[in-house]
Design a protein with these regions (language model features):
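Aromatic- and acidic-residue-enriched segments that line the glycan-binding/catalytic groove
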Residues: 1, 5, 54-106
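Hydrophobic targeting/anchoring helices
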Residues: 36, 46-52, 58-60, 110-111, ...
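Single conserved hydrophobic/aromatic residue that forms the stacking wall/gate
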Residues: 2-8, 385-389
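The substrate-binding groove and active-site-proximal loops of carbohydrate-active enzymes
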Residues: 13-28, 113-128, 168-174, 206-214, ...
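N-terminal accessory beta-strand-rich subdomains and adjacent acidic, glycine-rich linkers
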Residues: 1, 9-40, 216-217
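Hydrophobic, aliphatic-enriched repeat segments that assemble into extended interaction scaffolds
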Residues: 28-69, 278-283, 373, 378-380
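Helical hinge/lid and interdomain linker segments adjacent to catalytic or ligand-binding clefts
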Residues: 301-387
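Loop/turn elements at helix/coil->beta-strand transitions in domains of secreted/extracellular proteins
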Residues: 43-47, 142-146, 232-233, 319-322, ...
Length: 389
């Protein structure tokens, strides 16, 4: 089945949903031929929107089809024997299942990442980038533009890492659930434009006789709007089944209002530098790899255990600060990185990736941050110790 998006002549291909490893030679060859055939069969399409590339984020269900574990940044589903063999040949040491299982925590973003896991992530980003570039080159060769959907099978294409610059992507579109998820899209550099897919999706769970799509649309727009004033996306859109939306004329009226507001905001903000009171650095073990995604477990969905931490990042998304994301290794490599920072924010449960754990036992780190504070810098930290149970 071919599903057009709501904007322009962008289309995506969705055959029966089966999982295959595009990294292997035969499936790789098949995928490239399939891409060329799709372009040839649809000459009227001018933008191909790839619903990302190759590897789904970690999502585990139990035998009753209940969602039991999710990590929107998780690499656990990107493992295969073929990939692991390549990894071992490159890094020179054998891969162990524990590098992924991680004592049952599956390397969620709260775990201080091991060297081996970071090696695996870097390897995946490099290999994913090679094939993405091949696909975008085919797209451009055929006179089309390539757009990436930020989500779903997006592991290895993190937009703030060096590998992303090599992908050849023309544009990025992603779902907008709040200010943080908007900045996750709008802060991307090196693309011609960015687009936010606003909520709600035109699906039966909201568009039914008991649903209130206007209420959900208002909440979504007001939540995301403040971040647009700091760093705007270039376009907005919605997604789903148009026939459902047509049954709610008051919703269509509100969408028209949202579009008009967006045009006004964009006309005033695009190309300008908003006023910044200070420069803030969010410090954790991930740095720019998790920029605007700190404490983000399942995109913008509320999580009881971390909503206070996620709320800090959400607040920053629309606050008058120049926000950067750094990790401890950045400071270790270059302590001068702190010279133009006014405030460091380091918040999370104790001994997690968001506070640093054993990184605070590194003398050079302690020296750099103490010197930063001595010279007038500020640091905001929040360490919560949780019981083993």
């Amino acid at each position: 089945e071919i599903m057009p998006s709501l904007v322009g002549s962008e289309m995506c291909i969705r055959d029966s949903q089966i999982t295959f490893d595009v990294r292997q030679p035969k499936t790789h060859e098949y995928t490239m031929k399939r891409l060329r055939k799709f372009i040839e069969d649809h000459p009227y399409v001018n933008v191909l929107r790839f619903t990302t590339f190759f590897h789904q984020f970690t999502l585990v269900f139990d035998e009753l089809a209940r969602e039991k574990y999710v990590d929107w940044y998780g690499y656990s589903a990107s493992v295969s024997p073929y990939i692991l063999k390549q990894f071992e040949e490159e890094v020179g040491y054998p891969f162990r299942a524990e590098y992924i299982i991680d004592q049952g925590y599956y390397n969620n973003q709260y775990r201080v990442p091991s060297k081996e896991f970071q090696d695996f992530q870097a390897f995946q980003r490099r290999e994913v980038a090679k094939i993405v570039k091949e696909m975008t080159e085919i797209t451009h060769e055929c006179g089309k533009k390539a757009m990436m959907f930020l989500g779903d099978h997006w592991i290895g294409t993190e937009p703030f890492m060096e590998e992303f610059k090599t992908l050849g992507i023309d544009a990025v579109v992603g779902s907008v659930g709040n200010g943080s998820t908007l900045r996750l899209i709008s802060d991307i550099e090196g693309v011609k434009y960015t687009e936010g897919r606003l909520l709600p999706y035109f699906f039966p769970d909201v568009f039914n006789e008991n649903g209130d799509p206007v209420k959900e649309a208002k909440y979504n727009w007001v939540t995301a709007r403040r971040a647009i004033l700091r760093k705007p996306i270039d376009r907005i859109g919605y997604g789903g089944y148009l026939k459902l939306a047509l049954q709610f004329p008051e919703f269509l009226d509100y969408v028209e209002q949202v579009c008009n507001e967006f045009r006004t905001l964009y006309a005033n903000v695009k190309g300008t530098t908003p006023y910044c009171v200070k420069k803030v650095a969010v410090l954790n073990c991930w740095g720019k790899m998790r920029a605007w995604g700190c404490h983000m477990v399942h995109h913008p969905l509320y999580q009881k255990q971390n909503y206070s931490y996620a709320g800090i990042i959400e607040s920053l998304s629309g606050a008058p600060f120049d926000v950067v994301f750094i990790n401890f290794q950045d400071i270790l490599d270059n302590p001068a990185i702190l010279d133009d920072i006014d405030v460091i924010i380091n918040v999370g449960d104790a001994d997690t990736a968001h506070t640093g754990g054993e990184w605070w036992e590194t003398p050079k780190i302690i020296e750099a941050i103490r010197g930063f504070v001595y010279n007038g810098g500020g640091i905001i930290g929040c360490l919560l110790y949780t019981s083993p149970s």
